[in-house]
Each structure stands twice: as C-alpha cells, then as structure tokens.
Amino acid sequence: MVDGIADIDGRRMRYSVSDNLDASTWAVNLHSYMAGGGVYWRESSRLAGRLGLRVINPNLPGFSGSEPLPWDLLRMSTFAEGLTRILDHLGAPTALVLGHSMGAAVAIQFAHDFPERTLGVVYRDGVATSSWKHRHGLWSRLLGPLVPDLGTALDFLAAFATDLPDLAWSRITSLVATAAPDLRLNARSFTATLPVAAMLLACDYTAITTAVGEAGEIPILPMWGRFDRIVPPATGREFGELVGRPVQWVLGGHLWMIPRPATQLNVLRYDEAGMAFMEQVRDRARLLKRPAA
C-alpha cells in the first residue's frame, strides 16, 4: 500500500492505495469510527494480491490525518461525495465499496447517491439502520433514567471490551505497525472525531438503505461477526431484511476482519454467496462500461 494525499475542496484527505497498477477493477475499503485506512492494510493487501483489485484505503474526514469537515458540511452525503473526489483523483470511474461499521453507512450513502459509480457494496457490521443504538446492557438499565447518554457510552465501552480478547489472536507486531499511526493521530485529534460520533448517534439512514435495497441495481453482501456486541446481530438481520439479502455470518466480534484479515478474501473467493456476489460485481462492471443506447 502506498500513501497519498488528495485535495478535496481545499481540505487535505489522506489515503493509501495498492500498487498493482495492472488491476482493472477498483475497490474502496472504508474504516470504522476511531480507526483509519492503516488498520485495514493487511486485509486490503490480500484483496489486491489475490483478487486483482486496486484497493484504496481512504482516511475519512477528521480521522487519521485527514482534515475534518466544518459543522455546516458534517453529513453523510458529504462523506460520500468526498469518495468521488478520491476516485477522480486516482482515475477510478467505478469501484466496489467495502465498509465497516461507520464506513458501511458511508458505503450505503455512496451507493444511494452515486449508483453509476458503485459496482457493489460489502456491508460489514454497519450502522446505517437505527437498531444498533438501542442499548440494553447493564449500564443503560442502571443509568438510563438519570443520565441516558452516559449509560449508552458505558455500554459501548463494555461492548468494545469484549472484542479485545479477539484482537489478541492477531499478529500483534504486524497489527501495531499498520494500525498504531492511525490510532495515535485519532487520539490527538479526538475533538475532530466527536462531532462525527454525534452525527452517527443522531441520524438514521434506514430510508436510504431501504431505497438502495428496493432499487435492486447494486449487488450487496451483508457480513456480520457472530459475537458482535457493538452492532449486534439483530441489526445485521434488520439490514438483511431491508435490502433483501441474507447475512453472511463470520467468526469474531465487531472487529473480526482485524485479527483475521484473510476472512474477507476467503468469503469472496471460496464461499458460495461471496463468489455469487463477485460474479454480480463483474456483471455490473461490464454493464456500466457499455455506452448509453
């Protein structure tokens, strides 16, 4: 993966891109909240090397060195529009979009706003539908009547803690080398990321999700960690029903692709649903290349 910087309406946006220049199909791998493109380098490198995709890992506005959006532009549609500028910057007419958690919501917004540039969406443990915000943990029950926001925040932290043992199975030295710079930058610019968290908690993208599903034009592959406690399996089933696609359940929690970066590749190469999805992506790529009648 090679680092780069793009100018998006006068704001600096950092990204990395695989160096397989002969690849004919582009892909974008969108990160979760408080992460960055570097966290997904190992996964993207496998997708580039084995599937022949030219993979872009952007750092979304406010994260990992990319400049934040001003308050008046802080909305999901602006995030999606920024992706088109990255694609233009790199000369990519269309792309397969993979999104994790917050990035999955951005992926759905991109598919809704720019279907002509979307080859397909791999939606992973995403927050585009509202049920992920309905917390039923101990802290929400104890503090909900008095300070509901605090109860929700503590529940999210407790849910995140359940993923930490899973990360221990990762190749720690490799993970630290790729993820640490992004996490360090995010820690230093925490005030820039807090407004994004507020946006995610305040907004509901169910209508956009429903519209993309009802249109039926774009291939969608929902994937979910079986033991996800941050965005629970019920939210995965909700999303699958809205878009009319079965959810592919994988081993792990919310961060399943980080300790096991080969999982996504294996699903797309060897799983029946993943192979069917990739065939639909190739069909759509051929369709979008055809001249208008």
Predicted feature residues:
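Acidic catalytic loop of the alpha/beta-hydrolase fold
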Residues: 226-231, 255
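Conserved HGGG/HGGXW glycine-rich cap/lid loop of the alpha/beta-hydrolase fold
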Residues: 11-67
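Flexible "cap/lid" loop of the alpha/beta hydrolase fold
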Residues: 112, 119-152
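Active-site loop/oxyanion-hole signature of alpha/beta-hydrolase fold enzymes
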Residues: 54-98
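Catalytic active-site module of serine/aspartate enzymes centered on a nucleophile-bearing elbow/loop
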Residues: 244-293
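Short beta-strand/loop motif that positions the catalytic acidic residue
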Residues: 216, 222-224
